[in-house]
Swiss-Prot record:
It holds the Pfam family ERG4_ERG24. One of its GO terms (molecular function) is NADP binding. This is 7-dehydrocholesterol reductase. GO terms for biological process: cholesterol biosynthetic process. Pathway: Steroid biosynthesis; cholesterol biosynthesis. It catalyses: cholesterol + NADP(+) = 7-dehydrocholesterol + NADPH + H(+); 7-dehydrodesmosterol + NADPH + H(+) = desmosterol + NADP(+).
């Protein structure tokens, strides 16, 4: 893509509106962003994930298909010689052209909604921010524009799904789970294809060469990505599309398909399935309602686009984030009223903490600190950082509200919600609890990784901030 085609804008201020201040080169802070070199520990982790993550997804899905979602039974069969990985693999449904057609129609439909239907909901929904929005400043000092229309895409998709189930009957509501393992093949094909395309594109025709980072290691470059914001044309942004669509839009449809399968098999839908559908739908709708805010999060602001995001959004997210609903298809559980109420309360309290924490940060950014947090004017620490174009920018780190309790209370709320999904499945099997285990590892790692980047970005200013807010996730604990 030629430079004249790039969608970018240079600002004199930071994302929160502060003004740029020129400094002497000797006094400038180090340039922020991902490191140019990779250590052996990170490289080992990358190779391990490249080899192990696809196997883990297949193992969990096949364990549900052949062992009612038990993890121990297939392992015992393997240990006792009653089965081999080859025999388990052979018993699983294979790729089908019917599933390929379903998935191709699905992805194409989401591309059309993303590219061809400009957002109109922001014109009629008070408080909703959609349409063309600016992203955060990249390490090279660029600010990309995005068409934020995820909520609209989600609503159109689900209205059509409900109309089909109730009136048109073009396809069965169980179409997703009925083709679940063949669809796993299809999502893997797309995940590897888009990751490989992004890898090659970074070498041949990067969107913004200033934001590309080559570590010198092919495995790390492929896994973690080279381009920061790869695009095709002016508006098709790989990060925004593949993270939100087709994965997260599909999340609630997959859960609805699970519920329909429960109804088909047993003649009823359990309260546990309803809880999982409702709590996860709240999270999904929240994501799309706040999609403009998502443009300022770590996925967009720090992560380059590689296999980690490309394959992860196509395969890992839709198959492993929905494990609770899949488990309940094979193991229908009717929870007691106190148990169901406890799960609901935990999930809603977790969502409240997650949402209010993010709202406080967004409000603080939009008003440049001229607002009220918990009835008081927020306190903050002013920081500075340097982008690759040499400009010095100001930023403010809030130390009030939930952000004064711990540095990542939004993650704390997220983990509470994740635990609620798992507790809805009872305690007979480990598999539905994989999600809380994974999310704990992911978010703790993100805490450490994000803070390492912030330390590099802000230097001594970050030390002042961590002295003011001592804990990461849990006050007085961690």
């Amino acid at each position: 893509m030629m430079a004249s085609d790039r969608v970018r804008k240079r600002h004199k201020g930071s994302a929160n509106g502060a003004q740029t201040v020129e400094k002497e080169p000797s006094k400038e802070p180090a340039q922020w962003g991902r490191a140019w070199e990779v250590d052996w520990f990170s490289l080992s982790g990358v190779i391990l994930l490249l080899c192990f993550a696809p196997f883990l997804v297949s193992f969990f899905i096949m364990a549900c298909d052949q062992y009612q979602c038990s993890i121990s039974h297939p392992l015992l069969d393997l240990y006792n010689g009653d089965a081999t990985l080859f025999t388990i693999w052979n018993r699983a449904p294979s790729f089908t052209w019917a599933a390929a057609k379903i998935y191709a129609i699905w992805v194409t439909f989401q591309v059309v909604l993303y590219m061809c239907v400009p957002d109109f909901l922001h014109k009629i929904l008070p408080g909703y921010v959609g349409g063309v929005q600016d992203g955060a400043r990249t390490p090279a000092g660029l600010i990309n524009k995005y068409e934020v229309n995820g909520l609209q895409c989600w609503l159109i998709t689900h209205v059509l799904w409900v109309l089909n189930a109730q009136h048109f009957h073009w396809f069965s509501p169980t179409i997703i789970i009925d083709n679940w393992i063949p669809l796993l093949w299809c999502t893997n094909i797309l995940g590897y294809a888009v990751s490989t395309f992004a890898f090659i594109k970074a070498y041949l025709f990067p969107t913004n060469p200033e934001d590309c980072k080559f570590t010198g290691n092919m495995f790390y470059n492929y896994m973690m990505g080279i381009e920061f914001n790869p695009r095709i044309g002016k508006w098709f942004d790989f990060k925004l599309f593949f993270n939100g669509r087709p994965g997260i839009v599909a999340w609630t449809l997959i859960n609805l398909s699970y519920a329909a399968k429960q109804q088909e098999l047993y003649g009823y839908v359990t309260n546990s399935m309803i809880l999982v559908n409702v709590l996860q739908a709240v999270y999904v709708v929240d994501f799309f309602w706040n999609e403009a805010w998502y443009l300022k999060t770590i996925d967009i602001c720090h992560d380059h686009f590689g296999w980690y995001l490309g394959w992860g959004d196509c395969v890992w997210l839709p198959f492993l984030y929905t494990l609770q609903g899949l488990y309940l298809v094979y193991n229908p559980i009717q929870l007691s009223t106190p148990h169901a109420a406890g799960v609901l309360i935990l999930g809603l309290v977790g969502y409240y903490i997650f949402r209010v924490t993010n709202h406080q940060k967004d409000l603080f950014r939009r008003t440049e600190g001229n607002c009220s947090i918990w009835g008081k004017k927020p306190t903050f620490i002013e920081c500075s950082y340097q982008s690759a174009d040499g400009a010095i920018h100001k930023s403010k780190l809030m130390t009030s509200g939930f952000w004064g309790v711990a540095r990542h209370m939004n993650y704390t709320g997220d983990l509470m919600g994740s635990l609620a999904y798992c507790l809805a499945c009872g305690g007979n099997h480990l598999l539905p609890y994989f999600y809380i285990i994974y999310m704990t590892i992911l978010l703790v790692h993100r805490c450490i990784r994000d803070e390492h980047r912030c330390s590099n970005k802000y230097g001594k200013d970050w030390e002042r901030y961590t002295a003011a807010v001592s804990y990461r996730l849990l006050p007085n604990i961690f």
